[in-house]
Each structure stands twice: as C-alpha cells, then as structure tokens.
C-alpha cells in the first residue's frame, strides 16, 4: 500500500471521524485566503491524515461560497499527496441505493462557473492535463478497501 499522506474532505454530515487519534486543529493561511475551516491533523489506522470539513464545522458555508483553491492549497501545504473527498449525493439511477459507495474515475468540473477556478493567472500560464483527474492507484485502493469492509461499491 502507498505511503502517501491522505487528505479527507468531509461533505455534509461528515464532521467527525471515528478512530482519528492524536488530533490537532491547525489554522492554515494560503495565498487564496482561509480554507473552509481549520484543518484537523492526526492518525487514522496508523496513517498521517489531514481532515477538512468542506462546509466548515456547523455547516456554515454554502457550496457556491467554498474557497476551493484555499482548501486544496492548505492540504498541499500540510503535505497531503492524495485527497479523498466525501459527499452526500443522490442519484437518478435506481441501481444506486442509500449507503452505497461510488468511487468515481471521472467527473464534470462545475467550479468553472466561478471566476476563481484556477491556481494560475497574474502572469502564470499553465495547462493542466485533465483527461484522468482521478489517481488510478488511489481508486483501486478505495475500491478494494471498501469491498473488504463489506460495502456495496
């Protein structure tokens, strides 16, 4: 298994993680402002983990108000190499039931509705490949671990 430092971004309803030890809340300043909340560092199953409640503790930030750049920058600043983002969502497909786990391999980036959807600009020009935005290795680990835990994946 990889030794990458893991970042967890919790969506609606995920504010605490069972088994998270050595917890310490850390305030991280970024060039893009403050992230949604302080970041919680600690250990989970022996791994270094950084947790961020996406909407802030108390669910006080609307999805359209999220500072995605600050959230990602803060994770990177704390040494995170992989981010697992958890969301409570629905589906129009009946094959997916409540509590099923869906591990995506592609997504539609709707943050482009915002004027601040990139880390570049102000004299910095870059083109980032987006054909495979999900790490294949991380996806395999998530699927394997979820199935081993008895989840419907």
Annotate each predicted stretch with a short phrase.
Residues 1-130:
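Metabolite-binding pocket within alpha/beta catalytic cores that recognizes anionic/polar moieties
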Residues 133-153:
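Active-site rim beta-loop-alpha module in soluble metabolic enzymes
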């Amino acid at each position: 298994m990889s030794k990458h430092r893991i970042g967890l971004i919790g969506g609606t309803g995920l504010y605490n993680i069972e088994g998270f030890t050595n917890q310490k809340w850390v305030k991280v300043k970024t060039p893009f402002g403050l992230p949604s909340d302080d970041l919680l560092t600690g250990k989970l199953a022996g791994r270094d983990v950084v947790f961020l409640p996406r909407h802030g503790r108390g669910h006080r930030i609307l999805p359209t108000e999220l500072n995605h750049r600050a959230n990602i920058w803060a994770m990177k600043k704390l040494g995170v190499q992989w981010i697992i983002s958890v969301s409570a969502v629905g589906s129009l497909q009946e094959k997916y039931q409540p509590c099923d786990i869906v591990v995506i391999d592609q997504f539609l980036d709707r943050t482009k509705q915002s004027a601040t959807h990139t880390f570049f600009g102000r004299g910095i020009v870059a083109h980032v490949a987006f054909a495979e935005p999900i790490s294949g290795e991380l996806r395999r680990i998530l699927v394997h671990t979820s199935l081993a835990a008895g989840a419907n994946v």
